[in-house]
Amino acid sequence: MNVTLLSQPRKTETCMINADFLTAPLPDPMDLPEAQTEGPKRFFNRELSWLAFNWRVLEEAENSRVPLLERLRFISISAANLDEFDTVRVAGLRELAVEGNTTPSDDGRTPVEQLSLINADARKLMQSQQAAWIALREELEAEGISVVTRKALTDADKAALNEIFLANVFPVLSPLAIDPAHPFPFIPNEGVSLALQMKREKDGRPLQALLPIPAQIDRFVRLPAPTGETRVLPLEELLLVHINALFPGYTLTGSCTFRVLRDSDLEVEEEAEDLVREFETALKRRRRGHVVRLQVSTGAPEALKREITEQLHVIGDEVVEVLGMIGLARLKELVQDDRPDLMWPNFTPRVPERVQDHEGDMFNAIRQKDMLLHHPYETFDMVVRFLAQAARDPNVVAIKQTLYRTSNESPIVEALCEAAENGKSVTALVE
């Protein structure tokens, strides 16, 4: 049969598929094997199902029909998803396991059994993410976007990097010695650090040090490049190039990069008298949650690795050795607006004609007739405009809204806050 598939808005293509399943009779539920209708085996495990979804996200990074920089974005999304999964879902299961909780999930697995399966699958997923990044890195280089190492730097590169380092990086660094006289610093959630093994030049005395990498600095430093090309250096490589400026009189003998993921599961007492204060306290407590995953670069000196794991109180499968880049979520920083040829074409959603007829007045447009918006084909700006107008309209006395997820600087939240400041009753149910 002929089937028309909608691939992008207003573009169609026709292909032949076998769709006999559409006309096949459905099985009688009573004829299904008992194992499929009764007992825990009829359920998918919630956590393993989520990992399967994230495998599907990563598949888009391996899909050659997807533009190159969009594939890079999918690796970043997959890595960020896994980070969130570790800090919330895995953290919750670990807490249950530590408490000795053996209550099975709907599919019949205890927290310990689930953690074992999760760790095995998550490690495979991380390896596949690194493999996808290595393959994509070669394709990017063929398109004139190169991620170089410090060994490939020219004298001109080093001169340019020295200016960047002194002006933008050096002032915000805080190198720290690791010894009994200096307590191990607090490493925030998703924090990346360099662990260094050095010896003093004058007498060979050993020194272990830590160099936390500030999150506000871009993960990749742009290098001089011919017109039409892009060359970048990972920030940790830049720091190693300038290690003598940070530790004068010492020689580097070994190093590794590591990253910390902390328990970010939020627990609040919903019956608390002051819910706002309860959330503020919970958020502060979450910043210092215990470590649920430690990622360490492969080949780390054993003494450094031992020191880090002991200081962060992590053991066993909480430690993951990474062969490749640590913190793949920040690959999104390589997506460049000046390479539209490597991204999906821009899609401009339509503005409903009725809103235009009423010169943007949402209330008048809705008063004429109820409005149904289809996202992303019709712009979400209409929702933002509706709330912003409601926040300022003297006839609006209350706003009640459900919020699933918002951006860091959400215009929705801004409009709700403005409405509350204008004396309106505002209620939001937040996921």
Cite the ranges covered by each PLM segment.
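N-terminal localization/anchoring segments of enzymes in phospholipid and broader phosphate metabolism
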Residues: 2-431
